[in-house]
Amino acid sequence: MNTSDRIKSTQIALDRDLREQALLLLKEVRAVDGVDAFSEQFVRGLAEPGLGHSHLIVTLNDKLVGLAATDEETTELAVHPAHRRQGIGKALIDAAPTSSIWAHGNTAGAQALASTLRMKKTRELLVMEISDRALDGSAAYKDPDGITHSSLANAPVEKSVAEAKWLQSNNEAFDWHPEQGGWTTHRLAQAQKADWYKDSDVLFLWDGEEIVGFHWVKQHSPELQEIYVVGLSSAYRGRGLGDPLVRLGLHHMRAHGARKVILYVEADNTPAVAAYEKLGFTVAESHVVYEK
């Protein structure tokens, strides 16, 4: 039987046993590749039917050896390390309903497969990191003149008002972004359901009762934390407030025990990459979208 004939379509979020196999597969891939094959949203899609993700699976002797997950726009996939170079990755890509395929870590194997299939790289997302002494130096923070700061937990306005202003600031900052832009109240509420989310980790700079910008922190562990999203409202761009906004989050994370901080940034966002490098961040990983 050809590999393509063994592909089955399913929704793993509705099948507990299959979900456990999928999580085990992702763990085994991570152990070999040193990088997660699925992003956070696609991992959530394995357990949350409401996200509407569909899945393609390949099994061998009742063991899950290949998996592709798809939302409306992109596909992510994982192939068990012991079953690579057997046509599974190619078959999953051929069967995927989207043309955009993520290659997290852009491993040598992913690059070789993309080359074989004549796929083109259309997007690159960098993971940058800072740690130890460099982090200590960049975590110094002082409110700019006329500006105050808070978290969502102690905002100077009602929480619902702060959330509405946060949403507006986000959509102004990311009107160009395929995942972070165009958020709705429902989309924000869904994001706040993540098990790691805390109101105290959503930080704001304020000009009176207007949000200058926000810095959303994700704590993977006390030692490893992330600049999850950071953005400036339109009215406050070009005023030198991006640097203190980033430092506010670094100060918060360092105060909560962080020894390493990571972030994701588009590789072609040259000003942002340069600003993070100036703070002491270096590139740790590259994640690529290939088009078939």
From Swiss-Prot:
Classification via InterPro entries: Acyl_CoA_acyltransferase, GNAT_dom, MshD_Acetyltransferase, Mycothiol_AcTrfase
Binding residues annotated for acetyl-CoA 2, in chain numbering: 230-232, 237-243
UniProt KW Repeat keyword: yes
Binding locations of 1D-myo-inositol 2-(L-cysteinylamino)-2-deoxy-alpha-D-glucopyranoside: 40, 179, 218, 226, 264
Superkingdom of the organism of origin: Bacteria
Domain called N-acetyltransferase: residue spans: 13-168, 159-292
Keywords assigned by UniProt, alphabetized: Acyltransferase, Repeat, Transferase
Top-rank EC class of the record's enzyme: transferase
GO biological process: mycothiol biosynthetic process
Subunit-structure text: Monomer.
Family named by the database record: Belongs to the acetyltransferase family. MshD subfamily.
Chain's role: Catalyzes the transfer of acetyl from acetyl-CoA to desacetylmycothiol (Cys-GlcN-Ins) to form mycothiol.
PANTHER family for this protein: L-AMINO ACID N-ACETYLTRANSFERASE, MYCOTHIOL ACETYLTRANSFERASE
Official protein name in the record: Mycothiol acetyltransferase
